[in-house]
Swiss-Prot record:
Monomer. Residues 232-433 form the Helicase C-terminal domain. PANTHER family: ATP-DEPENDENT DNA HELICASE HEL308 (PTHR47961:SF10), DNA POLYMERASE THETA, PUTATIVE (AFU_ORTHOLOGUE AFUA_1G05260)-RELATED (PTHR47961). The gene is hel308. The lineage of its organism: Archaea, Methanobacteriati, Methanobacteriota, Stenosarchaea group, Methanomicrobia. Coiled coil: none annotated. The keyword DNA-binding applies. Belongs to the helicase family. Hel308 subfamily. One of its GO terms (molecular function) is ATP binding. Residues 707-720 have a biased composition (Basic and acidic residues). Residues 33-199 form the Helicase ATP-binding domain. This is ATP-dependent DNA helicase Hel308. Its EC number is 5.6.2.4. It catalyses: Couples ATP hydrolysis with the unwinding of duplex DNA by translocating in the 3'-5' direction; ATP + H2O = ADP + phosphate + H(+). DNA-dependent ATPase and 3'-5' DNA helicase that may be involved in repair of stalled replication forks.
Amino acid sequence: MKIESLDLPDEVKRFYENSGIPELYPPQAEAVEKGLLEGKNLLAAIPTASGKTLLAELAMLKSVLAGGKALYIVPLRALASEKFRRFQDFSELGIRVGISTGDYDRRDEGLGINDIIVATSEKTDSLLRNETAWMQEISVVVVDEVHLIDSADRGPTLEVTLAKLRKMNPFCQILALSATVGNADELAAWLDAELVLSEWRPTDLMEGVFFDGTFFCKDKEKLIEQPTKDEAINLVLDTLREGGQCLVFESSRKNCMGFAKKATSAVKKTLSAEDKEKLAGIADEILENSETDTASVLASCVRAGTAFHHAGLTSPLRELVETGFREGYVKLISSTPTLAAGLNLPARRVIIRSYRRYSSDSGMQPIPVLEYKQMAGRAGRPRLDPYGEAVLLAKSYEELLFLFEKYIEAGAEDIWSKLGTENALRTHVLSTISNGFARTKEELMDFLEATFFAYQYSNFGLSVVVDECLNFLRQEGMLEQDSDALISTMFGKLVSRLYIDPLSAALIAKGLREAGTLTELTLLHLVCSTPDMRLMYMRSQDYQDINDFVMAHAEEFSKVPSPFNIVEYEWFLSEVKTSLLLMDWIHEKPENEICLKFGTGEGDIHTTADIAEWIMHVATQLARLLDLKGAKEAAELEKRIHYGAGPELMDLLDIRGIGRVRARKLYGAGFKSTADLAGATPEKVAALVGPKIAERIFRQIGRREAVSEISDSERLEKSSQDGQSTISDF
C-alpha cells in the first residue's frame, strides 16, 4: 500500500515520501484497512521495529490537521523525550508538539496550545485529577507499550487513566500499541478496538541458542570462531567482523558493567582510526558530565568501543551512550533489561547472557517469555541490517532443548490486570470521586466496570476491595458520606491533586501531628516511610552502621520498631538508609562519595532526590491545609533537596545556571547573595565560574556589561578552589 494512496492531506504524503517512506509495511496496511484513518479504535500487537510508531503518526496527523488534538502516552520519561524529538519534525507541517512528564500537581494549561502532547501515564493521570481543560479536546489517544497494564507498578494507573479518558471523551479514537501478547484479542475487545495481530518484521529475525561453539537456529547452524575463552565475547566479535553491532542483556548492573569492561580489549582491536577519534570525544563528554568512579569506568569502556547502560547512570550519560551506538561508533552495549522497554536502539545481534533473574520471593527465576521477546525484538536494524539474531546461551544440550521450548518456540504469556488490590485501587478510588467521575458507591462500581480488571474478572471481585478503600478514606478524613453520596473533603481533594497515595498522605499527617522536635532527619525519615518512596537496598555491610545510627538518634524518629520484628525492622533500616543518603545530598557531599558509601549509582541519587522533593512538597501542602507544624521546615527542605545544598546557598541557587558546586564557590569567596553579586566586579566572578556563566549571572540580576575572557592559568591563580564541572553545576 503506497503512502500516496492514503486518505491524508497532500503535505503529509510529501513529508513521508521525502523521508524515504513511500509505502507501508504489511501490518501498517492492515491497520489502514481496519479503519486507522477513519477514527476507529485499534490495537496493534506487532513485533518491535515493525512500524508501530508510524501508525500512531498517521492517526495523529489525520486528526490534528482536521482540527483535533492528540495525546501520546508512554511509560517512561526517556521514551517521552525520544518521541518528542521525533514528533518535532512535524513542525514543517505547522504542527506544535509539547511534552509533560513531571510536576504532578500542575494543570499545565499552557500545554493546550500544542497539537500533539507527549506524556507519561502518571502525568496523564495527574492532568485528569487537576481537571486540565484541554484534556476534553483530545480527539486521538495513542497508548504506547499498552501491554504494561500487566505491570503491578504502572498497570493500574494506565488502566484507570484509559477508562477516564474514554468516559470523558467517548468519541475519542484509541490507538493502543503493544508487544505480541497471548490475549491480544481480549485486550482489543476491552478497548472496543479492531485488532492487528502480526509476526511480520522488516528484517528477518533468527532466534537461537549458542552451545559448544555453535549457534543453533530452528533451521540452520552456524559455527562461531573462538578467539577468546568467553562465549559472549566471541559472539560479539563475530558480529563486528560482519559489520554489525551488539546488545548484550545482563541480569544485574554489576554484571552489565563487568561484561562491558571484560570485552574492551577484544573490541578495541576492531576499531578504525575514525572510531577511536569519535569515541574519545564521547568519553570526554562523559567525564565532563560526571566525576564519579562509574563515569570513569564508562569513559574507559567507551574509548575501547564498549559501553554499559542501566538506571544507575544519569540521563546525560545514558543519552551519550545511546547516541554513540546509533551513530555506529559504540560497537557493544551491555545493558539491564530496561533498555528493551521501548527505546529505539536496535542492533544486528542481541545476546541474552542470563535468562534468570533474582526475585526476593523465590530466588533465581526464568524471565517471562514476553520479556525475552522484547529483548529479542531489538535484533535487526530496519533498512540497515539484512537480518537480526537473538542468541540465548546454554551450558548443556539439555539446557539448549529447554531454551528452545521455553522461549523460542513459545508464545508470549497472557497479560492480566493488577488493579484488584487495596494498594493499587486506593488512590484511584479517591481520584475518581474527587473528580466527579463517581458520586456514589453505585456510580463508582459502574465506572470501575469500564476497567480491564472488570472485563477479565467481573466487578464482583472489586466490590470487597472498594469497600476497604472507602472505609480507609473515611477514617482518614479524605471522604465523607451523606446518605448514598460520597463527598471528597478538602483534604481528600488536595491528596488527589498532589498525586500521592492516600496512605502516604495519612502517614505524613499523622507524623506531623505526633512529632516532637522536627529535625532534618525527622522530616526526611517521614518522607522515606511512605509507600511512594523508593527505598535503598540493604547490603550486609550496612546493618551494623545503620543500626548504630538508629540507636544514637532514636529520639529523632517518630517510632523505632522492635529489632525482634525482623521484617518490620529491616524495612525501617532501609528507610533510614534512604534518609541518610538524602542527608548527605543536602549537605553537599560529593556524588562519588555518596555512590561509594551507599552502594548506589549517580542516577539513583537523582531519582531518589526527585521523589523525596515531591513527597516533601506534599508534606508542605498538607501541613498548611491541616494547620500542622512543619510547613516552613518542609518547604525549606523541599528546596534544599531540589538543589542538593545547604540553606545558606538558596538565594544564589535561584539564579539559573548555578548548581550547588558553583554556588558553594561563590559563597566561599564572599558572594553570599544576589545582592553581593550585584556589587561584584565581572572579572572576579568570572575567575570563579568562568566568563560565560558570569555573563549569564549578571544578565539575570540586571547587569548587562560584557565579561572579558580570562585564561585558564589566570583563573587557576585567582581561584585555587576551581575544579572540574559535574552534572550538579548545571
